[in-house]
A protein has these predicted regions:
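Polytopic endomembrane small-metabolite transporters, centered on the Drug/Metabolite Transporter
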Residues: 1-311
């Protein structure tokens, strides 16, 4: 999915029957297309329709799901928009360090306490991510003054957008967890349906208010390959939700964390190969510091869970 995100945001598309190429600039339309993913929305709706008698009563007011949708939509917009200013590998390493904002939001939203080990892990991950980010900005020094100023402004813009993404993305699961904890417990399909529905409504209102819905559709209709890329991105997002839920249900969150970490590492190398990004030796050190800490944490959680089951 990351491949298509980067391709749509950073690569120009050729107009049909012409040699002219243009960039697709409306990140919000991509958020709308992803949240419109019929697979998640329709299947959740059908499941609720046919199984409503066996599902728990929906206790939380429906408007509470709009908070999840709002943070989810804004975090996705920040993620797509940031690709205009920072590379996909830089963005992925920053996303891997979202443990820190997740802990902050967990403390604020759910009053959760964290252990010393978790604080140390968070510090190591932030340290590695900072090294990786600074290694990419150090390459700016080799540019001319005007080019350097432009690159610095882009790096700052990308950093601000990634901070927005991390904070909003950290709020989303903590708020969902809070809703899930209210008895009787919500079913996953109820959560998926409500969040996707509110997200579609929020994006549609914003696109109509800005007048960019029709211009984005017009761009897609006049340029080659972008429709297929948007479709694959949307389907990847939808089936990704299903994959996450099935993995957690069958194998547990530890296996999911390991798979997601491996996916992130592979996506960085895949992006570097396909889009010509360069990573310095210092950048590789920061990269392996971040993902090494994450893998060690996953392994320690696995050992703890295994020990509890054997008792």
């Amino acid at each position: 999915m990351g491949f298509y995100q980067e391709r749509i945001i950073t690569q120009p598309y050729k107009m049909q029957n012409m040699t002219k190429k243009e960039f697709f600039k409306d990140a919000q339309f991509l958020v709308f297309a992803n949240r419109l993913n019929e697979v998640a929305l329709i299947f959740a709706g059908i499941y609720i329709l046919f199984r409503w008698k066996s599902l728990p009563v929906h206790v939380p007011p429906l408007y509470l799901h709009s908070f999840t949708s709002f943070s989810n939509v804004l975090s996705s917009w920040c993620q797509y928009e940031a690709l205009k200013y920072v590379s996909f590998p830089t963005q992925t390493v920053c996303k891997a360090s979202k443990l820190v904002p997740t802990m902050i939001m967990g403390r604020i939203v759910r009053k959760r306490q964290y252990s010393i080990r978790e604080y140390i892990l968070a510090f190591i991950i932030v340290f590695g991510a900072s090294i990786f980010f600074l290694s990419s900005t150090n390459q700016i020094k080799r540019e001319s003054n005007d080019k350097r100023r432009e690159e610095i402004n882009s790096a700052i813009s990308g950093f601000i957008l990634m901070c927005g993404y991390l904070l909003l993305d950290a709020f989303t699961p903590n708020w969902q967890k809070k809703l899930f904890e209210q008895p009787p417990r919500l079913h996953t399909s109820q959560m998926m349906f409500a969040v996707n529905l509110f997200s579609v409504i929020l994006c549609l209102i914003s696109l109509l208010q800005q007048g960019t819905l029709l211009t984005s559709i017009n761009f897609i209709s006049k340029h080659e390959n972008i429709f297929v890329d948007c479709l694959l991105l949307s389907l990847g997002s939808a089936f990704g939700q299903v994959f996450i839920l099935m993995t957690v249900k069958r194998f547990g969150p530890v296996v999911l964390s390991l798979l997601m970490t491996i996916r992130q590492i592979l996506s960085i190398f895949f992006s570097t190969y396909n889009f010509g990004h360069s990573i310095t030796l210092i950048g590789f050190f920061g990269l392996f510091t971040v993902f090494g800490a994450i893998i060690v944490d996953i392994y320690s959680k696995y050992r703890i869970n295994t020990g509890r089951r054997l008792r």
